[in-house]
Amino acid sequence: VRFIFQPAEEETGGALDMINEGVLKNVDTAVGLHVDPETETGKITVKDGEFFASPDFFNAEIIGKGSHGAQPQNAVDPIKILTEILFNIHKNVDSATENEVVMSVCKVNSGFSENSIPDTASFGGTVRAFDNVLRKKADIAIEETIKTACEKAGAKYEYKYTYLYPPLINDKNVTELLIKSAEKAVGKENILTAEKNMLGDDF
């Protein structure tokens, strides 16, 4: 039995680095344990099949033309363009994926002063899905939303979608074995069935 303490389950991804260091040499089966503040102490939640979603990221920059705030007619205002994108992006992604993914815009940045329209505006976020086809559909829908708004306003854009890890899908046989073992340790009454969720983990 080998205990492994993995860092960075999202974003940079600690699992691959540990594998490359040889941590899984001569290992037949790996079982992950994730701390959950919503689970009561002494209880274990477990689920076979789909459990954690793929945690993809996206980032975009809208490239317009700055101007003095008193002369907006001389600008290609990236903030106005970004506002339109943010208004449409959720409904476009939901429509393209039939409401089967979670997409959240988590950061928005633009401007430095109160009287100057900036040249650029940027935003980024995450897409969570249990299906690789839906991941691609979300990617396309996000870029199409950006492209449409920028072309209409005469702006340019840069866009990057980062495909991180596939969904975490637990093996049924290993899950059943884990449940039997856990029952001996904490009692059958303390083994709960977990719900699949949109968190991510590269385990």
Regions found by a protein language model. Give the residues of each.
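Histidine/acidic-residue-rich, glycine-tolerant segments that coordinate divalent metal ions
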Residues: 1-107, 111-118, 201
